[in-house]
């Protein structure tokens, strides 16, 4: 990162970006797109005209966010967690208000009610500016389906949650653990779901950041959302009931599992 104003002081956000950069540098050879992410981080500059306004985060959303941060326990992610805590007061969290989708996109009630994101580097609404690159954090509530979708922007996810489910290119669902990386090339379809913990991740759009996301309709959305809703009700009734409703794929949720997808 560089600075437009040499008098700008070090911020919690810059330290957070540095922690993310350090994590990605150690995995630079695992996915080709990481090199582009790192190059764009290095070429970002302090935003001179930052608008920090955003929707007020509700008490429930704040509780969900704090739970997601507390759930970051994998050793490789602890510097990011600690930097995130120090930068909390500098971050502005927003819900997607048709910024990433057209206004008529049916993303499901779970997504609409619980999605939050904050930007660290972006063309707008971030402390650091890049004309065509974004880096930030994305949050979804527990037991939520983020429906199958695609976008022109190549995308990197760094999973921070203990476990999250992913469906890539319409294939089978597979679970990934904390520290795992997901790479989606341009217009590659992907979906994710959370279980009894919030879904929390670092995300980055490498280029084409002004392109909108589009849904890739699947016939099983209603069933998936009903299953997640039933698991949510079971968790309210007592966590001792929850293991009976969780997916069988938990052994795949290994730390540092990495999937590489070709563009």
Task: Please name every model-derived segment.
Residues 9-130, 230-231, 241-245, 259-263:
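A short, N-terminal "cap"/entry segment at the start of jelly-roll beta-barrel domains
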Residues 130-132, 156, 170-189:
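Short acidic-glycine-tyrosine-enriched beta hairpin
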Residues 146-149, 165-168, 184, 189-195:
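Short beta-strand His + acidic residue motifs that chelate non-heme Fe in jelly-roll/DSBH
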Residues 195-263:
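Double-stranded beta-helix
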């Amino acid at each position: 990162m560089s600075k437009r104003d040499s008098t700008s002081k070090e911020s919690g956000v810059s330290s957070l970006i540095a922690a993310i950069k350090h994590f990605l540098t150690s995995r630079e050879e695992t996915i080709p797109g990481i090199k582009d992410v790192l190059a764009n981080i290095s070429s970002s500059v302090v935003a001179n005209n930052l608008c920090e306004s955003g929707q007020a985060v509700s008490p429930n959303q704040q509780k969900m966010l704090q739970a997601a941060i507390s759930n970051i326990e994998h050793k490789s992610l602890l510097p990011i967690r600690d930097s995130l805590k120090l930068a909390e007061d500098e971050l502005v969290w927003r819900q997607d208000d048709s910024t990433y989708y057209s206004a008529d996109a049916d993303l499901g009630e779970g997504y609409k009610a619980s999605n939050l994101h904050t930007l660290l580097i972006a063309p707008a609404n971030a402390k650091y500016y890049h004309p065509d690159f974004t880096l930030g954090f994305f949050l979804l509530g527990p037991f939520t389906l983020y429906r199958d979708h695609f976008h022109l922007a190549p995308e990197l996810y760094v999973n921070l949650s203990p476990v999250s489910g992913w469906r890539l290119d319409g294939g089978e669902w597979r679970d990934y653990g904390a520290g795992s990386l997901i790479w989606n090339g341009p217009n590659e379809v992907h979906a994710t779901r959370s279980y009894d913990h919030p879904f929390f991740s670092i995300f980055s759009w490498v280029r084409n950041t002004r392109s909108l996301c589009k849904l890739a309709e699947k016939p099983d959305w209603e069933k998936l959302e009903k299953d997640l809703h039933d698991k949510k009700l079971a968790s309210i009734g007592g966590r001792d009931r929850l293991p009976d409703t969780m997916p069988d794929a938990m052994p795949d949720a290994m730390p540092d599992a990495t999937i590489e997808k070709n563009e």
